[in-house]
Amino acid sequence: MSISFSELVAKTLLDLEVKVVFGIVGIPVIEICEAIQASGIRFVGFRNEQSAAYAATAYGYLTQRPGVCVVVGGPGVVHAMAGVFNSKTNRWPLLLLAGSSETFQQNCGAFQELDQVSYLSPHTKLAVRPPSPKMVVDSIRRAYRVSMTGTPGTCYVDLPANYIESTVDDFPKDPLPPIPSSPKCAPDPTQLQKAAYYLKNAKAPLLVVGKGAAYACAEKQLLEFVEHTGIPFLPSPMGKGLLPESHPLNVSSARSAALRNADVVLLAGARLNWIFQYGLPPKWSPNAKFIQIDTNAETLGNNAADLDLAIWADVGLTIDCLFKLVQTWKYSVGISTPYLRTLNETRSKNEKKALESRKSSIPLQMNYALYVVNEELQSLSLKSKRNITWVSEGANTMDRGRQLLEVTHPRGRLDAGTMSTMGVGMGYAIASAFAHSSDKIVVVEGDSAFGFSAMELETAIRNQLDLLVIVINNNGVYHGLDTDAYETLRDNHQLPTTALGTSIRYDQICEACGGKGFFVKNEEDLRSSLRKAWQTSSVSLINVMVDPEAARKLTFAWMSSTKVKPKL
């Protein structure tokens, strides 16, 4: 009995319990993609390899199993490299499969020839070409396992065209067992004792919850820890939702005060990178001590972190063990400390200020538009008992959405991540529709960010996915121009580098692909469109025109300076 190579690849993925594969067909992988689909695995064909690879990385994050992406060789691999980089920097598991030139045509100028194993090796955990067609089973299974073991990342398997055209006689006829999830590493007891000592002696402790804790599914342990100890917490943008945003110990509204005053900081799957200003003054206290919990050893001790207080282990296991050591200690339950009073006063002041700024106007202000989006959709979510998974992308839109869009459940928000990568939005949304199929997937993007992957609207519509896409349209990158200024400056060839076309009808692109589009300029139409789109079980796009903010100074919460420095 023989089997085609493509069928063997599909069987291997099926044995691994892969449910969905993202990619783009082409020579020579079209036969593999068709075999995958024939096996019962869902194949989602994209319009661009970048988006397909981004989708696979997000699926890996949401499921804690490698997302699988199939692309053609040469330029297809180069395009998919964006997803490989995304996987590496965010530490999400990805299995990339790609076609390649025939082995006997190597170095002959073959069709789309590229030494893909060498090209990808520096950026992956494993990059292999099976030594023979029958060895593809071992290669894929090994790559799948390595991708999610230890620090998650990308593994690559090269599939030469002459392999794809071959048949295999010697292969495992019975289903192979699935690969179990990655084993979890327990913390060093000595490091735990140190961490417990510092926490118990802290005057101003702070728990920082990162997306590493979200990937570790540590929400139960974190909630128990916070509610018992009374330590205030601050979630990273993708750590939001692990703990209730309405929790009285959530100090997101007093972020600057929390960073400036904390003396002992417990980092649960969060990195001291640009998102948290490296742990350095003036954003942080110069005397702050950082207790790091991370599964990536190379991260430990970075920037202001102290390697002596580092814990190389699973976040959930570590918090559970640490909780047992501090069970007899409480920081603030039932009491008020000067540190907590400062945080509460700052939070109340900032929340009052935010409330006062919520005023309807024409044109709509971006902050108010986002406030309306959150208020309306949270109400609809509550009535329908259906969670929202947010996908947020853009500069201003993402930065402000971090504060204004409420996340109600773990892993309920995806954004541009560690590298602040633009173009991930639609790929992430499509992945979320498969990983969180019971949720309403809501994509909130700036108009410039949406342009990176707008044609994936057709992918979502073709696959009959339930997505609500909201484009916050200010006619530009960061900020834009009104129509009069745009036309005057364009005629003189003096358009600012940040300017995009005015009032572009992104809603009509959605309608042209078979979806539902809404074009809104005021609060009443925005609320009405949100209600209609919520009831739609296919793809809807609401194009929200907001103030271009041409005169607004560029500032972001993560910037160490209020001035945008030029790239050298």
Swiss-Prot record:
| Compartments in which it is found | Cytoplasm; Peroxisome matrix
Question: What EC number(s) does this enzyme carry?
Answer: 4.1.2.63
The alphabetized list of GO BP terms reads: fatty acid alpha-oxidation
Q: Specify one Pfam family.
A: TPP_enzyme_N
Name the InterPro entries for this protein: DHS-like_NAD/FAD-binding_dom, HACL1-like, THDP-binding, Thiamin_PyroP_enz_cen_dom, Thiamin_PyroP_enz_TPP-bd_dom, TPP_enzyme_TPP-bd
UniProt: thiamine diphosphate binding residues: 49
This protein's UniProt keywords: Cytoplasm, Lyase, Magnesium, Metal-binding, Peroxisome, Thiamine pyrophosphate
- Give the catalytic activity: an (R)-2-hydroxy-long-chain-fatty acyl-CoA = a long-chain fatty aldehyde + formyl-CoA; a 2-hydroxy-3-methyl fatty acyl-CoA = a 2-methyl-branched fatty aldehyde + formyl-CoA
Coiled-coil positions are none
Tell me which GO cellular component terms the UniProt record holds: cytosol; peroxisomal matrix; peroxisome
Q: Enzyme group, top EC level? A: lyase
Q: What is its main location?
A: cytoplasm
The record's section on PANTHER family has: 2-HYDROXYACYL-COA LYASE, 2-HYDROXYACYL-COA LYASE 1
Family from the record: Belongs to the TPP enzyme family.
Functional note: Catalyzes a carbon-carbon cleavage reaction; cleaves a 2-hydroxy-3-methylacyl-CoA into formyl-CoA and a 2-methyl-branched fatty aldehyde.
| Protein name according to UniProt | 2-hydroxyacyl-CoA lyase
The scientific name of the source species is: Schizosaccharomyces pombe (strain 972 / ATCC 24843)
